[in-house]
């Protein structure tokens, strides 16, 4: 009986750890994060199979960023207007496609010191046995508008946990809930950097 209980506990812990994805964080040590008073967020790019993932993730990220924000955040309308003024060609908003000169021009046009750009890599329900769980993966970069350099990056992948018939803690069943958790984590890490 004791062996079965130990096996059950170890199995549950292993499954819980597997359901948590990791993250990667880069902070440019030379950047003065106290300098940023007004920043902007561009709509995230979408590499996932869900056509609406960019709107859902960008909206959730912006909401989390606005909560207890230490900086002023330009409106999405102002950012899109500036983006159209500066970027004349049709392309997606992949962080890798924004040049240093374009970031500097966006900063001047939108009157911001930094830009957050991101990409949704995965946004889906994945099957595990007979159940489906949410999977969300995003990468967010903060670009300094004076230098055009990337000064902060956060990449994260999270998958919802399996259902336990007896224990129901720490589970995430919907893409909306998982998106909110991922965006809260990224926005929180960014706000901590601004301290």
Regions found by a protein language model. Name each.
Residues 1-9:
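Bacterial N-terminal signal peptides that target proteins for export
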């Amino acid at each position: 009986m004791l062996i079965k209980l130990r096996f059950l506990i170890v199995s549950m812990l292993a499954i819980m750890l597997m359901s948590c994805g990791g993250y990667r964080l880069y902070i440019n040590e030379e950047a003065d994060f106290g300098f940023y008073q007004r920043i902007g967020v561009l709509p995230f790019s979408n590499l996932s199979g869900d056509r609406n993932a960019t709107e859902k993730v960008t909206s959730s990220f912006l909401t989390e960023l606005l909560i207890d924000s230490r900086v002023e955040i330009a409106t999405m309308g102002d950012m899109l207007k500036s983006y159209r003024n500066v970027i004349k060609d049709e392309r997606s908003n992949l962080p890798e496609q924004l040049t240093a000169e374009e970031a500097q021009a966006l900063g001047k046009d939108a009157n911001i010191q930094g830009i957050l750009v991101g990409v949704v890599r995965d946004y889906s329900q994945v099957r595990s046995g007979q159940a489906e769980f949410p999977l969300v993966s995003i990468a967010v970069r903060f670009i300094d508008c004076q230098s055009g350099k990337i000064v902060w990056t956060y990449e994260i992948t999270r998958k919802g946990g399996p259902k336990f018939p007896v224990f129901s803690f720490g589970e995430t069943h919907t893409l909306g809930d998982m998106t909110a958790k991922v965006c809260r984590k990224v926005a929180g890490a960014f706000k901590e950097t601004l301290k």
